Amino acid sequence: MCIRDSISLKHAIHSVHFPHDAEELRQARRRLAFEDALMLTIVLQMLRQERGRERGIAFETGGVRNEFIAQLPFELTPAQCSVMDELEHDMSAPRAMNRLIQGDVGSGKTVLAMYAMYIAMKNGRQSVLMVPTEILAEQHYVQLQRYFGNKCALLTGKTTQKERIRILNGIRSGEIIAVTGTHALIQSNVEFNNVGLVVTDEQHRFGVHQRALLSQKAESPDVLIMSATPIPRTLSLILYGDLEISVVNGMPLGRKPILTRLVPLQKRVSMYRYIETVSYTHL
């Protein structure tokens, strides 16, 4: 849209309420849509510039990748290696990283988050991975144990009081170098020692306030976001325009493709039966 070919903003505001005809209403809506898009673009650019001025942590990444890969029981895909390059570039820079990793379920995003957390550990920094559900936190904890041994922890609403005290003391002292959990991580009694990296998985399921509280528990930490939700490129620029975006567009060997089905309302009962059958089959 060329602004020179459109009506003025004042004219558009009046015409959207009192149009003379359908064409004038169309032009008014088009002009207001342009105004919204322009304001959003300006705000996102201001956020990007502001974050670019923030002093972050310049992590040392030399040799870390080979050490990390040596522990993997599988080979990485070209897409994963490409994202690793981007992570190393961001984390070694003196400004704070703000990156979104987007990819289908099973594309290998988790190992990339583990790699970023591993870089933080090798630099003597803590890292935290917040997820929306306890089941997902438990799954990530299994992965953390592979790379961090007894220096990692799981903190959720189900954590017993005795275990919670042990974990909180370990986080505060720096003995625990990597922790994953749910919103329990942002409670006021959780005090980190030296956080360098904050990771959120499926961040759209957290409120803005929750994500801000987590990031505020450290001073200018690197931020990594993961999402398996398919987001069109244009929409991602609106939702994450202030972030750098990495796309894991390949699947590891042997992984089944992700199939999406639209089920009409009248076939909902059949869908439930199918889900139940599949669930029992994989128990």
Where would I find each of the regions flagged by the language model?
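Generic, well-ordered alpha-helical scaffold segments in large soluble proteins
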Residues: 40, 44-47, 71, 86-90, ...
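Conserved small/polar residues in nucleotide/adenosyl-binding loops
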Residues: 1-5, 281-282
